[in-house]
Amino acid sequence: MKRAADYIEMKSPAKPEYVGIIRLTLSGIASKMGYSYDDIEDLKIAVSEACTNAVQHAYKADNNTGEVSVRFGVFEDRLEIVVADQGDSFDIQDKQKELGPYSPEHTVDQLSEGGLGLYLMETLMDEVHVQIDSGVTVSMTKFLNRERVDDGTTVQNYETN
């Protein structure tokens, strides 16, 4: 695995008004890396969903007194983003069962209420991992200079040695 050329970390209060600042930072990083406008918009939506989930659910019992940590790993071929909170966690398998199955064949109308965020993250990003421990950590990766084929696999547009 290649080392990150740059590593950027932000911490913000778990309040909705700070999600926009995280989006602006992400937009600047992705633009500097050379992502297309459409990819930048996809990145912003996915990160907004992860941050909004942390704001709405992690610190509900504490009146949003916690913080959201966002880390950006800037690699030559990808951007890795980690959104983490130390608030209330949940069982990901139980949540997926509760929300029901979904696939690219489903329409937005077929998604359960509350299931759209994870669906969007998984659809817009190349890799998404959710870790539940003391809080929730969502790790997402978007590759640079790639094309998607119909089966959802990523095809690299450059040769590796």
From Swiss-Prot:
Signal peptide: none annotated. CDD domains: HATPase_RsbW-like (cd16936). It is an enzyme of class 2 (transferase). It comes from Bacillus licheniformis (strain ATCC 14580 / DSM 13 / JCM 2505 / CCUG 7422 / NBRC 12200 / NCIMB 9375 / NCTC 10341 / NRRL NRS-1264 / Gibson 46). This is Serine-protein kinase RsbW. It comes from the Bacteria. The lineage of its organism: Bacteria, Bacillati, Bacillota, Bacilli, Bacillales. SMART domains: HATPase_c. HAMAP family: Anti_sigma_B. One of its GO terms (molecular function) is sigma factor antagonist activity. Keywords: ATP-binding, Kinase, Nucleotide-binding, Serine/threonine-protein kinase, Transferase.
